[in-house]
Design a protein with these regions (language model features):
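C-terminal alpha-helical interaction module
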Residues: 2-265
């Protein structure tokens, strides 16, 4: 899930590994939603011992009847959900734990907030959510409209990254994290599964360099599991992929030199 992935990256970047534990659901989301069914990617809920994500929502609110979504920031002392909104959790991880052991790196710095907010407002509807609009479209017209918007957005970001190492300037911010989690999934999943196949990210020199740049930051690679990402999408969306066959490719080298240091540190 690209939204949950944002929070895992921020946890790594802020050095919160020992302060905030994680549980990870099974990559397959079936008719009963997310579960902690045993699998290589699953990290069981060691705090409450639940088998299904919905049980956590029920623990927090016995009357809860909505969807059980990820990510969740869970308060194990209060046995409560602090937040299940990824944007909120990313902001919390960025600053709320600085006094108890997180490093001082700021990914939402005051001087850049206007630019960060502007890029977030552009990237979310056109890319983060745009690929889903294309993938789950049920008419040709809706699909073409969504897919066209995706590639128009990629063109705009490609142009921006030609002259700026990161979206808001020379330093990494939360806007880049939000962009990265969509781009890292694009060639393995969205290009084929969601029919966003006009071009691949590897066909955009600056986008592809950006993906490798962020991937190679300390700790980020630990949060990327392409096999699990592919398994989730291709197995969990029977209306899009009825056979649930997971493709074996593509072969991508995220560790290759990116050369983006020339744009500033």
């Amino acid at each position: 899930c690209p939204w949950a992935h944002r929070t895992l990256i921020m946890r790594k970047l802020k050095g919160l590994d020992t302060l905030i534990g994680i549980s990870a659901v099974n990559s397959y989301m079936g008719e009963h939603g997310w579960t902690f069914a045993p699998a290589p990617e699953t990290i069981p809920d060691s705090v409450n011992g639940v088998a299904r994500l919905y049980e956590l929502y029920a623990l927090a609110d016995a009357q809860y009847s909505g969807r059980a979504t990820i990510p969740i920031l869970w308060d194990k002392h209060q046995r409560a959900i602090v937040s299940n909104e990824s944007a909120e959790i990313v902001r919390m991880l960025n600053s709320a734990f600085n006094e108890v052991g997180a490093n001082g790196n700021d990914y939402y710095p005051a001087p850049l907030r206007a630019d960060i907010d502007e890029w977030n407002a552009f990237v979310y509807p056109n890319l983060n959510n745009g690929v889903y609009r294309a993938g789950f479209a049920t008419t040709q017209e809706a699909y073409e409209e969504a897919a066209t918007a995706v590639f128009a957005a990629l063109d705009k970001v490609e142009a921006r990254l030609a002259t700026h190492r990161y979206l808001a300037g020379p330093r990494l911010t939360e806007a880049d994290i939000r962009l990265f989690t969509t781009l890292i999934r694009f060639d393995p999943v969205y290009h084929g599964h969601f029919k966003c196949n006009r071009r691949r990210i590897v066909d955009y020199p600056n986008l592809w360099g950006f993906v490798r740049d962020v991937y190679q930051l300390p700790g980020v690679a630990d949060t990327v599991h392409i096999d699990f990402i592919k398994a989730h999408y291709y197995r969990s969306h029977p209306t899009v992929n009825p056979s649930r066959i997971v493709p074996i490719g593509p072969a991508l080298d995220y560790s290759a030199p990116h050369g983006r240091e020339r744009l500033g540190a």
